[in-house]
Amino acid sequence: MAQFTESMDVPDMGRRQFMNLLAFGTVTGVALGALYPLVKYFIPPSGGAVGGGTTAKDKLGNNVKVSKFLESHNAGDRVLVQGLKGDPTYIVVESKEAIRDYGINAVCTHLGCVVPWNAAENKFKCPCHGSQYDETGKVIRGPAPLSLALCHATVQDDNIVLTPWTETDFRTGEKPWWV
């Protein structure tokens, strides 16, 4: 029978501890690396505005400058920007000098399609299932069960800042469903 020599077959404790720590560190690093994007997904992005608001962004991701915005749009225009939580939001041009004090979330309340503005008919029409909303985003024809969500739109330092709308919905006189 072969003779067993302890010194050749069993590594010393220092080496064993080192290998255990190396394995633990590798597994921990991989686990943290995999969890980081998941945790980051649940943390809302910062819009750079004060008071919980988000600065409106154009399709390229740049801040919308009100002075240039009003020069290039006419009264009554509804223009898509990136708004609260990254949702597409319409900014309503009131005149060549001002925007309305609210923005309209462009996500249909039926199945989540982006609802385009139809200037010829003066209403929003969902391309997915035909829901229609008036110029303020109030539902006028289903299957959408609710009006489009609102947000406050204010001008600060030539930027459009969007903040959550928590007051009574002026279109329905009811508490907002999106709060």
Swiss-Prot record:
Major location (coarse): membrane
Cystine connections: C113-C128
SUPFAM superfamilies named among the record's database cross-references: ISP domain
Single GO cellular component term: plasma membrane-derived thylakoid membrane
Cofactor: [2Fe-2S] cluster
Record Pfam families: Rieske, TM_PetC
Note on cofactor: Binds 1 [2Fe-2S] cluster per subunit.
GO aspect biological process, one term: photosynthesis
Record keywords: 2Fe-2S, Disulfide bond, Electron transport, Iron, Iron-sulfur, Membrane, Metal-binding, Thylakoid, Translocase, Transmembrane, Transmembrane helix, Transport
GO molecular function: 2 iron, 2 sulfur cluster binding; electron transporter, transferring electrons within cytochrome b6/f complex of photosystem II activity; metal ion binding; monooxygenase activity; oxidoreductase activity, acting on paired donors, with incorporation or reduction of molecular oxygen; plastoquinol--plastocyanin reductase activity
Limits of the Rieske domain: 61-162
Binding site for [2Fe-2S] cluster: C108, H110, C126, H129
Ranges annotated as spanning the membrane: 21-43
Bilayer topology term: Single-pass membrane protein
Catalytic activity: 2 oxidized [plastocyanin] + a plastoquinol + 2 H(+)(in) = 2 reduced [plastocyanin] + a plastoquinone + 4 H(+)(out)
PROSITE patterns associated with the record: RIESKE (PS51296)
Localization (cell): Cellular thylakoid membrane
Note: The Rieske iron-sulfur protein is a high potential 2Fe-2S protein.
Purpose: Component of the cytochrome b6-f complex, which mediates electron transfer between photosystem II (PSII) and photosystem I (PSI), cyclic electron flow around PSI, and state transitions.
Family: Belongs to the Rieske iron-sulfur protein family.
Record-linked PANTHER family: CYTOCHROME B-C1 COMPLEX SUBUNIT RIESKE, MITOCHONDRIAL (PTHR10134)
Name of this protein: Cytochrome b6-f complex iron-sulfur subunit
Native source organism of the sequence: Mastigocladus laminosus (Fischerella sp.)
Lineage: Bacteria, Bacillati, Cyanobacteriota, Cyanophyceae, Nostocales
